[in-house]
């Protein structure tokens, strides 16, 4: 006679082995009527012990091994975030030093412009002086651009809204009489309504002039920045080779300083001497994650508190 709930349990190896090794008195099975009740009670008692022993027989060594692996794997998180935070500290120090060097170069004494391409590369952000005259008939326009005004930016620092206006930077061929070559000069910023040179005739300087400018190098097109369109005289980034080819000049560019500004003309001094420096934010982020994950790791594996 099959007993309810017994058949399946008897199939378990641990239960079957336990029953085979358990002595049973024959008197319990002698009487047919008594056999069923006695057998049922006996099996329930012994099966409860066997199943408990069977299901609780997971190796403690296996559990300990799994916990150890998990423990050291999770420890990699605070270690990695601490390393990234330290790396950002080093990057910030390097960036601050680079900014200081750039500011020192810009504030240096103007030197004569050289025509050697290798020397030009070493002169980026260095002020140079040139003498010659402009060819306003071949102006190029880099747009859209906003006015670089350090004083206004300092006043509006921290404000949600600013009075920045959109416009363009005017690139004009400049024949250097002392060098015998034509270079490119970024005369400065004009608002959008003044891009057309006919709207600013007083600002079109004629005759030989002497000016000071900052040497600038070629720009690389950034993601999402439109391509230049030389046929329409639309430039979105400084491609010196293409610009020089269009106007017949050398691929040398200087940004005229603010002292070169004339009434009605472009506003000079549009060199922004700054570099993106967000390393402090990254430092706080990585070290914050390191502190949080270290706390959770110690709570879990040192203090043995369930998370």
UniProtKB/Swiss-Prot annotation:
May play a role in mitochondrial respiratory chain complex IV assembly. Probably involved in the biogenesis of the COX complex. InterPro entries: Surf1/Shy1, Surf1/Surf4. It comes from Xenopus tropicalis (Western clawed frog). It is found in: Mitochondrion inner membrane. One of its GO terms (cellular component) is mitochondrial inner membrane. It comes from the Eukaryota. This is Surfeit locus protein 1. The gene is surf1. Belongs to the SURF1 family. GO terms for biological process: mitochondrial cytochrome c oxidase assembly. The lineage of its organism: Eukaryota, Metazoa, Chordata, Craniata, Vertebrata. Keywords: Membrane, Mitochondrion, Mitochondrion inner membrane, Transmembrane, Transmembrane helix. Its main location: mitochondrion. The chain crosses the membrane at residues 69-87, 282-302. PROSITE patterns: SURF1. The keyword Mitochondrion applies. The keyword Membrane applies.
């Amino acid at each position: 006679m099959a007993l309810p709930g017994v058949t399946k349990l008897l199939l378990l190896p641990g239960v079957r082995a336990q029953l085979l090794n358990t002595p049973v008195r024959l008197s319990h099975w002698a009487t047919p009527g008594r056999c069923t009740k006695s057998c049922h009670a006996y099996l329930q008692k012994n099966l409860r012990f066997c199943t408990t022993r069977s299901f609780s027989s997971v190796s403690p060594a296996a559990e300990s091994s799994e916990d150890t692996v998990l423990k050291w794997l999770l420890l990699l998180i605070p270690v990695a975030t601490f390393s990234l935070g330290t790396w950002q500290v080093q990057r910030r120090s390097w960036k601050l030093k680079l900014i200081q060097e750039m500011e020192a170069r810009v504030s240096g004494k103007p030197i004569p412009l050289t025509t050697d391409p290798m020397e030009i590369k070493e002169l980026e952000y260095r002020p140079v002086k040139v003498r010659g005259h402009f060819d306003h008939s071949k102006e190029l326009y880099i747009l859209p651009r906003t006015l670089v005004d350090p004083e206004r930016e300092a006043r509006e620092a921290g404000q949600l809204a600013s009075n920045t206006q959109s416009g363009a930077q005017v690139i004009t061929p400049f024949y250097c009489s002392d060098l015998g070559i034509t270079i490119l000069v970024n005369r400065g910023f004009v608002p959008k309504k003044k891009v057309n040179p006919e709207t600013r005739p007083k600002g079109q300087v004629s005759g030989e002039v002497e000016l000071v400018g900052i040497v600038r190098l070629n720009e690389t097109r950034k993601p999402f920045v439109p391509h230049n369109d030389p046929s329409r005289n639309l430039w979105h980034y400084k491609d010196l080779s293409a610009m020089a080819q269009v106007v017949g000049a050398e691929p040398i560019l200087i940004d005229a300083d603010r002292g070169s500004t004339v009434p009605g003309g472009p506003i000079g001094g549009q060199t922004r001497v700054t570099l993106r420096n967000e390393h402090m934010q990254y430092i706080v982020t990585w070290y914050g994650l390191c502190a949080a994950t270290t706390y959770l790791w110690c709570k879990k594996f040192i203090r043995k508190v369930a998370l």
